[in-house]
Amino acid sequence: MLMISILYSLFPPLLFPSLLAAFGASIAGGIVGSYIVVKRIVSISGSIAHSILGGVGIALWLQYQFDLPISPLHGAIASAIFVAICIGNVHLKYHEREDSIISMIWSIGMAVGMLCISKLPSFNSDLADFLFGNILWVTSRDLYFLGILDLLIVATVSICHTRFLALCFDEKYMALNRYSIKAWYFLLLILTAITTVVLMYVMGVILMLSMLVLPVSIACRFSYKMSSIIFTASILNICCSFLGIILAYILDLPVGPIIAILMGIAYSLSLLLKRSCNTSTPSPVSPESKINS
């Protein structure tokens, strides 16, 4: 309630739904993005993110062609989870061909989405919204659904944080404690899939990786502790998202590209700041960090 009161007092009421959606997406991106960067599965998350367009396109086409009560958000979540499971199987069973198969899934997902969207009467408008984001027009129904997804992400990570750390740093630890590495890996990919859907409304399909990766990369330059990285990345996401929404509203420009540019500027400034401190740049997170940190 305090956050809602602050948003109402600081920003125009018209922007409140967009800012609320951006706040939830920023938290999700900061949390899950930290595990993605540390586990070094950015390319896998990129494939999941871009394959979402296939589910969005199919949902829009079914909605237009057969008047079915299916929203693009439903299509996005279904395709994201499906692709995450497919890529997880590829990673675990066909590691030597992983890059080629992931690239194929990435390409097919986007191709299917673009073909379906091309059959819609408002091709250019819809394609731009889902490629580059259009959070300024988020509906209350979408906001509730995004809130549920965000709560699911936060609750899961709060319960499973130690297991995810073990998965990222020490799989032998998991094996010795008889935890299923495969099951936890799939859970992380599914969380990544859900997060990409949440970020789709802020950044669009093409630019959402900047919200997953860049804030975490900035945070990793100044901290070794996972909890600090998650907190810093989430704050950076919130700041860049809020500023991007306000600038987009004032300048009448797409939100996603502005946020991506702000993220890039923040990353460049972090490089300069780190260099000015004359300290060596740390690796994303030290393997010697405690598993329960």
Curated annotation (Swiss-Prot):
Lipid bilayer topology: Multi-pass membrane protein
Keyword terms: Cell inner membrane, Cell membrane, Membrane, Transmembrane, Transmembrane helix, Transport
Transmembrane annotation, as ranges: 18-38, 41-61, 68-88, 101-121, 142-162, 186-206, 242-262
GO (cellular component) term, any one: ATP-binding cassette (ABC) transporter complex
Gene Ontology terms describing biological process: response to zinc ion; transmembrane transport
Subcellular location: Cell inner membrane
Primary role: Part of an ATP-driven transport system TC_0696/TC_0697/TC_0698 for a metal.
Family (UniProt): Belongs to the ABC-3 integral membrane protein family.
Identification of the protein by name: Probable metal transport system membrane protein TC_0698
UniProt source species: Chlamydia muridarum (strain MoPn / Nigg)
